[in-house]
A protein has these predicted regions:
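Non-catalytic cap/lid and distal C-terminal segments of serine-dependent acyl enzymes
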Residues: 1-242
Length: 242
């Protein structure tokens, strides 16, 4: 139940093989794109299979993976168009995550806590929200990943909206300790989010934010190759800073 939106919210939770309630596992939150839901990253992109295989062969740490539903509106159950009102509902997920979902996970599962043990990764709109979360809550999240993050993290105009921005360009910076990892990637032929991911990279570079940025040659927005690449590379490094 979410006090943020006043209703029950769906979520998928992937537990490690041989999950042991007496152990504590780091937690990765995986965020979907616009018009999608808690099933999309599994059904369309097989993110759960990629991560499970990586854990099995030792290329990723054992972890709990949480696939939430991001559209956090009190009035609507689903996104019905690209409007500022609907985008604000995706932004409101940040409140739902910190206020309701994280305490639920930490109370009901063998979840390790603290920024050393908490990561967020997202695709498209989910990538934008993952970056916002990383800059807003550096004390809670130590690992931030974004594949093809959508417009609107900072003020800007795209083909659909004039985005007011969740943060200013100057706010894409840290006055305290940075996360252990910020990774962004995108196809270099992305016709949906265009050059916005690269713009975020350039702003972070200008602001002295240590991060990894790369492009996947010839790949578009919904490319299996691009999404699986960023997922794989992020999960190789997550929870391994110490």
């Amino acid at each position: 139940y979410s006090t943020t939106v006043g209703k029950n919210r769906p979520v998928n939770i992937l537990l490690p093989v041989n999950y042991d309630e007496n152990k504590e596992y780091p937690v990765l939150y995986v965020l979907h794109g616009i018009y999608c839901d808690q099933n999309t990253m599994m059904d369309s992109w097989k993110t759960h299979i990629i991560i499970s295989n990586m854990i099995a062969d030792g290329s990723a740490e054992e972890m709990i993976v949480v696939f939430p539903y991001m559209f956090a509106s009190k009035d609507k159950d689903a996104c019905d168009g690209i409007t500022l009102e609907n985008v604000a509902a995706y932004d409101n997920f940040i409140n739902d995550l910190v206020t309701d979902l994280m305490p639920f996970i930490e109370s009901n599962y063998a979840a390790a806590t603290g920024k050393d043990n908490t990561a967020v990764f997202g695709f498209s709109m989910g990538g934008r929200e993952a970056l916002a979360i990383g800059f807003m809550y550096p004390d809670l999240f130590g690992y931030i990943g974004a594949d093809a993050p959508a417009p609107g993290l900072v003020p800007g105009q795209d083909w659909a909206l004039n985005h007011p921005g969740q943060l200013t360009e100057d706010e894409l910076s840290y006055t305290t300790e940075m996360p252990y990892l910020i990774m962004m990637g995108a196809g270099d032929s992305d016709g949906t989010v265009g050059s916005f991911p690269k713009t975020y990279h350039e702003i972070m570079e200008r602001n002295g934010v240590t991060h990894i940025w790369y492009e996947i040659p010839g790949e578009d927005h919904n490319s299996d190759k691009a999404i699986s690449s960023v997922t794989y590379n992020f999960c190789r490094y997550v929870f391994r800073a110490k």
